[in-house]
């Protein structure tokens, strides 16, 4: 596919503005990089001031300052010339934040459909196919002469990709890179990101909201609505238009390794209320929200990043549990739905078999050798017309964007080549093909399927039309660029911090306190040992927010154990534990997609905890998987924080110290132990007086 000279998006002066943006020269690039540097330094300083527990080694790369004493006058002269060039060159398209971002409508506007039809009339088949492709990118600064940047530019200019999903990266570099790629695109790029827990999930030095299960533990759907709106505003300030949130899965399987705290809980009606609230807030804030993972990923024991989960239930069961939140989301006007890589043999019994090993694309999500291969599986929802086409599009009447889960996950790559997966997904009813491992193979597969008559050109146009209309209604035709100064005013501001802290404090759940250890009453006189156990590679900083807050009211020592901890480290931790009066077991068993130890804790930590139980008073706190009490039923005091976000860790410390009330309730049951809705309520007055408070009945 050669580069076409024909212009089909905008004519006349608009082309000159884009051309000016593309060819502003090295000095213009120097000016922009200087702005990025200045903004990044100011932003990092502000974040460091607001959160003193942050360590310097976790911040973005060291900044090379653009000016030195030598040659200063020469550089200033060059800078002034560059500024003059920018001032008198034709203006680039206005940025999104320079005009008000409108709420995203529940249905495409008439103007959007007209514009989409005008563009389709001018597009080649290759250009229409390109709109369906949504490539993945870890954003960072890329020199314009680098191979990586050239490859990205080629995807935009030659493959005509319709969008980009952003993964982890620094704030300013991410926005700067998206602006550069937007300037190369004939049709504005649709930029997306997984922002289930706010901007902090994908952008460094920004704020993570508590996981959905923590939001539900508060009992207040308005928190979900406010979180959705703040997330949307921050997303637009970061150049993101489509967010893959909320999770609409009902987590009714305690062994689920990938959904867990990402869900609002196990009750489908409760999940539906919170899902709808988040969608309303997010789309009011000007982004497309995405309900995922249709028709429900909550009752699985396999992570679809590692293999293909099977849910062997019939339609009646789905109607009574899994489909309830998705029906509610559709009624609320959700803009997008993501089918999951989930096998449902009672809905689609089409048998599939694994590819020969040499044909399997190495999944970047899964640990080496950790893939789970089901020898005889059935077609996943992502590629099933019976599930996506007949059920979602037909019976449920969904008319928005259908976005596949990532095409490079083992749930697909173990069974399908990329070109075949792309064709089957479009046959099933998908519009956007998310994060293919081989975009060229997907494009080639779709093109050949049309030429062979397997897919019609009209079917490609259907999806391209939906995508183009969405871009119009997002305001991207008029405003595709994002100004850096909006980041300083909007992202990681006081509103987001306050909301995260408020949700966190209302979420902390005291499930059990048979030992009457909460709150800790002895203050600085009590010797406390914090045994932190993590399933991540973050031992140097994982417990810092908790210990820093706890140290304000108690004397505490901490040791961190992970899967690499030696027997000597375990022994030293136990020695320190025996010298303490109270041991806090901080359990960081978090969702770790694609990892074999997701939601669990490592063996070394498990051995240490079992050795302490029964010897010392132990307060267990789960900063992740709430079901861990089932593995350690001997814990006489157990709190759930539902995640390791700094706001949740600080809230847990304040709750232990008696500085804040405890009002959260379990959104899930702990089978054999506690029912959904359990939560010992400790109000401020009661805590100060030391009154005994009985466990409240489940709501």
Q: Model segments located where?
A:
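Preference for extracellular/luminal or secreted protein segments
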Residues: 97-154, 384, 394, 414-699
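Second-shell residues forming the walls of enzyme active-site clefts
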Residues: 121-124, 164, 173-189, 193, ...
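Bacterial N-terminal signal peptides
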Residues: 78-90
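Bacterial N-terminal signal peptides that target proteins for export
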Residues: 53, 57, 63-80
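Aromatic (phenylalanine/tyrosine) cluster motif
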Residues: 8, 30, 43, 56-57, ...
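Short glycine-enriched loops at secondary-structure junctions
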Residues: 138-141, 191-201, 241-251, 291-297, ...
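Polybasic, lysine-rich low-complexity intrinsically disordered segments
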Residues: 38, 49-50
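Catalytic domains of carbohydrate-active enzymes, especially glycoside hydrolases
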Residues: 150-167, 229-242
């Amino acid at each position: 596919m050669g580069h076409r000279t024909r212009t089909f998006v905008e004519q006349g002066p608009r082309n000159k503005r884009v051309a000016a943006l593309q060819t502003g020269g090295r000095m213009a690039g120097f000016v922009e990089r200087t702005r990025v540097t200045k903004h990044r330094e100011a932003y990092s300083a502000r974040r460091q001031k607001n959160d003193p527990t942050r360590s310097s080694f976790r911040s973005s790369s060291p900044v090379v300052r653009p000016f030195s004493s030598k040659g200063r006058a020469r550089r200033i002269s060059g800078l002034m010339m560059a500024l003059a060039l920018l001032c008198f060159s034709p203006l680039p398209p206005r940025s999104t934040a320079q005009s008000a971002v409108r709420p995203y409508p529940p249905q495409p506007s008439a103007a959007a459909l007209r514009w989409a039809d005008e563009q389709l009339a001018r597009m080649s088949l290759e250009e229409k196919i390109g709109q369906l492709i949504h490539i993945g990118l870890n954003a960072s600064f890329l020199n314009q002469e680098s191979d990586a940047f050239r490859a990205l530019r080629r995807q935009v200019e030659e493959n005509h990709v319709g969008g980009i999903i952003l993964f982890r990266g620094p704030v300013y570099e991410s926005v700067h890179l998206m602006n550069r790629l937007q300037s190369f695109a004939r049709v504005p790029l649709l930029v997306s990101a997984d922002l289930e827990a706010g901007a902090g999930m994908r952008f460094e030095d920004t704020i993570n909201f508590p996981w959905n299960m923590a939001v539900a533990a508060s009992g207040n759907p308005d928190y979900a609505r406010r979180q959705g709106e703040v997330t949307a505003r921050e997303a637009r300030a970061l150049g993101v238009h489509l967010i893959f949130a909320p999770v609409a899965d009902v987590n009714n399987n305690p062994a689920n390794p990938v959904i867990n705290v990402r869900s609002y809980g196990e009750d489908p009606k409760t999940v539906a209320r919170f899902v709808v609230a988040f969608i309303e807030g997010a789309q009011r804030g000007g982004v497309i929200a995405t309900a995922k993972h249709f028709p429900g990923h909550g009752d699985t024991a396999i992570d679809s990043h590692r293999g293909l989960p099977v849910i062997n239930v019939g339609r009646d069961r789905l109607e009574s549990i899994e489909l309830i939140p998705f029906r509610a989301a559709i009624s609320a006007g959700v803009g997008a739905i993501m089918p999951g890589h989930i096998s449902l043999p009672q809905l689609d019994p089409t048998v599939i078999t694994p590819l020969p090993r040499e044909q399997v694309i190495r999944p970047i999500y899964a640990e080496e050798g950790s893939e789970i291969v089901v020898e005889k599986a059935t077609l996943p929802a992502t590629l099933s017309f019976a599930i996506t086409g007949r059920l979602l599009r037909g019976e449920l009447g969904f008319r928005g964007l259908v976005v596949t889960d990532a095409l490079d996950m083992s749930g697909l790559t173990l069974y399908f080549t990329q070109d075949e997966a792309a064709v089957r997904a479009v046959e099933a009813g998908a519009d956007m093909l998310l994060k293919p491992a081989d975009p060229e193979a997907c494009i080639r597969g779709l093109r050949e399927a049309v030429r062979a008559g397997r897919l019609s050109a009209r079917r490609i146009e259907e999806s391209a039309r939906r995508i183009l209309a969405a871009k119009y209604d997002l305001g991207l035709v008029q405003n595709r660029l994002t100004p850096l100064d909006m980041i300083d005013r909007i992202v990681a501001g006081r509103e987001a911090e306050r909301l995260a802290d408020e949700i966190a404090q209302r979420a902390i759940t005291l499930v059990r306190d048979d030992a009457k250890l909460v709150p800790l009453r002895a203050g600085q006189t009590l010797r406390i040992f914090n045994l932190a156990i993590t399933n991540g590679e973050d031992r140097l900083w994982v417990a810092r927010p908790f210990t820093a807050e706890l140290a304000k009211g108690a004397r505490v020592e901490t040791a961190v154990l992970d899967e690499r901890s030696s027997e000597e480290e375990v022994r030293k931790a136990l020695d320190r534990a025996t010298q303490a009066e109270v041991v806090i077991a901080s359990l960081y068993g978090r969702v770790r997609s694609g990892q074999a130890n997701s939601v669990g804790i490592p063996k070394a930590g498990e051995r240490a905890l079992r050795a302490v139980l029964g010897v010392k008073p132990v307060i267990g706190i789960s900063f992740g998987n709430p079901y861990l009490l089932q593995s350690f039923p001997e814990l006489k005091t157990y709190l759930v924080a539902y995640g390791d976000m700094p706001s949740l860790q600080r809230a847990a410390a304040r709750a232990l110290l008696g500085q804040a009330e405890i009002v959260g309730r379990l959104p899930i049951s702990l089978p054999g132990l506690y029912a959904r809705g359990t939560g010992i309520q400790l109000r401020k007055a009661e805590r100060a007086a030391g009154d005994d408070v009985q466990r409240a009945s489940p709501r």
